[in-house]
Amino acid sequence: VLVDGAHAPGSIAVDLAAIGADWYAANLHKWAHAPRSCGILWSRPEHQATLHHPVVSWGSGRGFHAEFEHHATCDPTSYLAAPEGMALLREWDYNAVLAYMHSLAMEAGRVLTDQWKTTLDIPKDMRGAMITVPLPEDAGATTGDATRLRLSLLVDEGIEVQLHAWRGRLWARVSAQVYNDRSDIVR
């Protein structure tokens, strides 16, 4: 079982043993305060021999860590900065930060669904610091509609939001980070 935990680290508590994954991959750039291009790839020890880096390099065939440690020519800055981002999370009351971000994301969902007259139907166990909110049906229904609206919001309003088409309507992916507050929602 491969778990794509893209936005989990720093957004929700992650317990790899409880998940029961054979492999786990995730980003660290959004919620764990690491630079872009930094992420993690974890494998159960018994599966590490089956996982190989796509770039053949000096470590090829020398084991899991050697194959993934150095590959081609790359800038290691993001890897070196990642521990600092994780240390920042440890300095804060991590549970309080998660509760704040989750609460603010749900508040954003309530504000938007009230304004758009749509409904937010997310089970409590699937709520996090990022939620997906349905736009009104007349906002569009296609990927092209999503692209046009996203660019219009960015250029005309200075708002960056991920929009996508699904099930015949547009949806907005809204994130609440520790540095956001309610004024960012109503802006």
Q: Can you say where each PLM-predicted feature lies in the sequence?
A:
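Catalytic PLP-binding core of fold-type I/II PLP enzymes
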Residues: V1-D22
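The feature captures the short pre-catalytic strand/loop hairpin that immediately precedes
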Residues: P54-H70
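Structural signature of PLP-dependent enzymes
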Residues: A66-R110
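PLP-dependent enzyme catalytic core of the Aspartate aminotransferase-like
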Residues: A141-D145, V155-R187
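Active-site PLP attachment segment
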Residues: I19-G59
